[in-house]
């Protein structure tokens, strides 16, 4: 996921 994406906290890499 990206930083600021809905459901993503911390800005992990997915």
Swiss-Prot record:
Where on the tree of life does the source sit, at the highest rank?
Eukaryota
Q: List the disulfide bonds.
A: 1-8
Annotated positions of the Leucine amide modification: 14
Keyword entries, A-Z: Amidation, Disulfide bond
Entry annotated with the keyword Disulfide bond: yes
Biological role stated in the UniProt entry = Causes stimulation of sperm respiration and motility through intracellular alkalinization, transient elevations of cAMP, cGMP and calcium levels in sperm cells, and transient activation and subsequent inactivation of the membrane form of guanylate cyclase.
Q: What is this protein called in UniProt?
A: Resact
- From which source organism is this entry? Arbacia punctulata
